[in-house]
Amino acid sequence: MQSLSQLGPSEIFLVARREKPSTRAQLWFTGRLSFRQETNGIRLKNRVEFSPRPVPPNLIAAEKEEAKAVLTLFFKKQGLSNSLSSRLINKSDLFIDHLVSRLHSVHKARYLVGRELTTLEIRDSLIPYLEQLHEEHGDLLAELVVSFPDPPAEPRLVASSPVSVLPPRGDTDSAADTRKLRAVSRVSELDTEGALRPQTLYLLDLGLNLEQIKTITRKFAAFPYYSLDGKIKPVVEFLLDLGIPKSDIPTILCKRPQICGISLTDNLKPTMAFLETLGIDKNQWAKIISRFPAILTYSRQKLTSTVEFLSQTGLTEEQIGRILTRCPNIMSYSVEDKLRPTMEYFRSLNVDVAVLLHRCPQTFGLSIESNLKPVTEFFLEKGFGLDEIGIMISRYGALYTFSLKENVMPKWDYFQTMDYPKSELVKFPQFFGYSLQERIKPRYELVQRSGVRLLLNQVLSLSGIEFEKVVKKKMMKLVSNNVIAEQSSGGLL
């Protein structure tokens, strides 16, 4: 006799129950299955041991949504498109039930004492299992998931009809819409006394409106099933204790509702402590979380890989800490797909990547093809050399964050009318960061009327008062020089 946790993935598919579990009344179970070998094959005999503790239906629903999210993420990592992943998930109800049952089996002790699993714990439990299945079944995994608990079709069938396991698009879209509508309708459901659910009332009190809660649910269907006292309220109170204003809570939940599925003691607080060891200023947590709450939902492996990359560029620990504090969303960038290619591109322009990262880390979130290359090509067309462009980027990394059409080009056109050589832009690329209508034009026109000459950075970088002082001083000097010149010419006569 073997327990479910001792069986390999292939054996689990053989011993899986063929009937769909009830979603109305479910109990905690150990999931132990026994079987014996007979002459005509494997005969199964289920022995399910129940605990008297019932599984709340809303918890089952939430765990199913979490399992779907993990499976979708896994499919995407295997190279499947968003639409194909969604179609597979919509046809995999029995496999999703199996994943939830596996969670109950692996974490039996947690469930017996009534402790819910966090989002990260669910992910950490299911990803290795899915990787093991993929290692065994390879390209058949998609069909295996859809056909569960039946074994997948023979490889030749998949080769001849690669999408035969998928339902018609209309059916999958309808199923997805139905589940989404069910979750959204839960937000505004009334009890027998005509009151909204406690979760909804609590969120309304925080400042969200019903439409915002429904929007969150459309993005993350597990959210309305989260326990108020077990998940939502403890996280919100913790955020408030950090100094985050109550008015910022709705924005945080809209940005990252998954944060409510994270255990404070097992995940959230340890993640914060770990980030502090990487240099994040612990006194800035309120600002960091308000700006980018997703940073608390990333695995330690992802956080570490990003920091290791930053270190490889030549940044010091102190500089890395400042970057993470000022621009925490850099943690969302993939090292291999985003950060490293961007680093290589800037190095091809002879840019000091460490300096650029420290000054303007958000530049590394831009698309090379859509944002970086067009700006580089624009300046090359205008006669700047690669070395000059590299100097401009190093001095003003934000240059590449501006819209080429709406910002850079109009300002370049106006610069052509100004009495400055191109070299002034190499010295002072910050020119592109000032407002054309409110700063550049008014100040340059004043300089022209005054008849004085200033460096480009003097025209734009000085405060209003200092700018006026410099212009007046230059004018007085100009008048004084003219008087002296007139006197000198008169003496000669």
Swiss-Prot record:
Source superkingdom: Eukaryota
GO CC, one annotated term: chloroplast
Knockout-associated phenotype: Pale-green phenotype, reduced growth and altered structure of chloroplasts. Defect in photosystem II (PSII) function with strongly reduced levels of core subunits, including psbE, psbF, psbL and psbJ cotranscribed from psbEFLJ. Enhanced osmotic stress tolerance and altered sugar responses during seedling establishment.
A Pfam family per the record: mTERF
Example GO molecular function: sequence-specific double-stranded DNA binding
Signal peptide per UniProt: none
UniProt-annotated location(s): Plastid, Chloroplast
A GO BP entry: response to salt stress
Transit peptide: 1-43
SMART domains: Mterf (SM00733)
Tissue specificity annotation: Expressed in roots, rosette leaves, cauline leaves, stems, flower buds and open flowers.
Keywords: Chloroplast, DNA-binding, Plastid, Transcription, Transcription regulation, Transcription termination, Transit peptide
Similarity annotation: Belongs to the mTERF family.
Record PANTHER family: CGI-12 PROTEIN-RELATED (PTHR13068), TRANSCRIPTION TERMINATION FACTOR MTERF5, CHLOROPLASTIC (PTHR13068:SF9)
Functional note: Transcription termination factor required for processing and steady-state levels of plastid transcripts. Involved also in chloroplast transcriptional pausing, a general feature of chloroplast genes. Specifically and positively regulates the transcription of chloroplast psbEFLJ encoding for photosystem II (PSII) core subunits psbE, psbF, psbL and psbJ; causes the plastid-encoded RNA polymerase (PEP) complex to pause at psbEFLJ by binding to the +30 to +51 region of double-stranded DNA, and recruits additional pTAC6 to the transcriptionally paused region of psbEFLJ.
Assembly and binders: Interacts with pTAC6.
Name of the protein this chain belongs to: Transcription termination factor MTERF5, chloroplastic
Organism: Arabidopsis thaliana
